Amino acid sequence: MASLLDRKKTAAQVVALARSDEKISAQVLLKGIFTEFIEFHGDRGFADDPAIIGGLAYLNEQPVTVIVTNKGQIPEEKLQTHFGCPEPAGYRKALRLAQQAAKFQRPVIFLVNTAGAYPGKSAEENGQGEAIARNLLEFSTLPTPIISVIYGEGGSGGALALACGDRVWMLENSTYSVLSPEGFAAILWKDSSRADEAAEVLQLTPEKLLQQKIIEGIIPESHSQRRLCRAIKKTITTEMMQLQQLKTTQLLEQRRLRFRKF
């Protein structure tokens, strides 16, 4: 994947790269950024959604809670995770782990790559809308630092429910949008073939989002997954150190102001 420094890409090209099968996986990120990861399972209410991997880990020597969306690596796993689209149990698992992190004063790290929340019948029957809304509500006042990194697709409320961070960063070949370009084109123009045009209108690329101050920064990508993990780790570490210097009241006020300005 070419770096931002190499050449300018169209929005459609960024969308394609964000969706690429060559995109770094959740498992590689966990191993490359954190140590001693211990996975926790289940939402303690209904099920364990494999589209969300979460647990405890060390970032350098700092204990953190890390929550990652998982698109799967083999066909069977991709089907089980709905290609990285969480069900309500996944969002509730994320909330459970984040609340536990706040209880023990651990920072929360979200690594997000999802086209959106799973839109299937089972998800709606089990309260998909409520689960997303609950996360938005609870994360807005969670008394511990939250850092989110979008490393692929950041689609709709399904991504926002995991990206209510004090700091939000994106990999250069990633997207963050209210809906997919295909969905936008189909709804507004009744023509999904105009997806490339819609991608430009949506301004879903990291460069556009940085200009609008929706994200804090862009992490350049590399052909080397090890080098990319180091870059993400450095960014998270720097942001975490700054956030931990704030009093809880300051942290929450800054978070409130961050999202109110949108």
What are these regions (language model features)?
Residues 1-186, 190, 200-262:
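Terminal-region recognition feature
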